[in-house]
């Protein structure tokens, strides 16, 4: 493993093949446009290249399709053992992300449990918001729960504010 290189695990990337499996021609077009014939679920891929596929799905097929890809992530990506409650699942999303992406500045997911029925998730992982929301939906669905309704516009605005704050902090750090 080259820790200087940002990489994304094929098992997580493979979620789009599974989620869009009913539309094989769409999957084949996405793969061809990305310059590959297939996604190997056991291989590591360039992080930015992999994330660009998710953006392409959102751009060409739409946000609902990308959310479906995110929901499928729990079936194809590596998740740590012992996630036997919704609270453990949410708290484990950051670790799960680190099992599927590696290298500098790939981000993470931080969960703060507010009480027995609510949590706050901070996603610094790069990628489309709808993918992240789909991952959250798929994770919650494992336990018969559904995340509260958040609009894509709210998530985009929060991400924009977060990136602006990160830039401000970097500018003042010695």
Predicted feature descriptions by range:
Residues 130-147:
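Short, non-transmembrane amphipathic alpha-helical segments
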Residues 123-131:
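Short, well-ordered coil↔helix boundary/capping segments
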Residues 1-114, 127, 151-154, 158-163, ...:
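N-terminal accessory segment detector
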Residues 117-123:
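Short, aliphatic-rich beta-strand segments
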């Amino acid at each position: 493993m080259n820790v200087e290189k940002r990489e994304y695990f094929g098992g997580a990337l493979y979620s789009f093949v599974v989620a869009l499996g009913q539309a094989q021609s769409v999957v084949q077009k996405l793969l061809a446009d990305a310059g590959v014939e297939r996604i190997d679920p056991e291989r590591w891929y360039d992080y930015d290249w992999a994330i660009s596929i998710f953006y392409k799905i959102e751009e060409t097929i739409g946000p609902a399709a990308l959310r479906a890809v995110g929901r499928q992530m729990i079936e194809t990506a590596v998740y740590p053992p012992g996630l036997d409650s919704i609270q453990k699942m949410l708290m484990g999303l950051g670790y799960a992300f680190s099992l599927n992406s590696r290298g500098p500045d790939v981000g993470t997911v931080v969960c703060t449990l507010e009480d027995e029925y609510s949590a706050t998730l901070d996603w610094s992982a790069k990628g489309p918001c709808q993918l992240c929301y789909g991952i959250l939906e798929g994770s919650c669905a494992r336990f018969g729960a559904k995340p509260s309704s958040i609009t894509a516009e709210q998530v985009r605005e929060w991400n924009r504010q977060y990136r602006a704050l990160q830039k401000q902090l970097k500018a003042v750090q010695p």
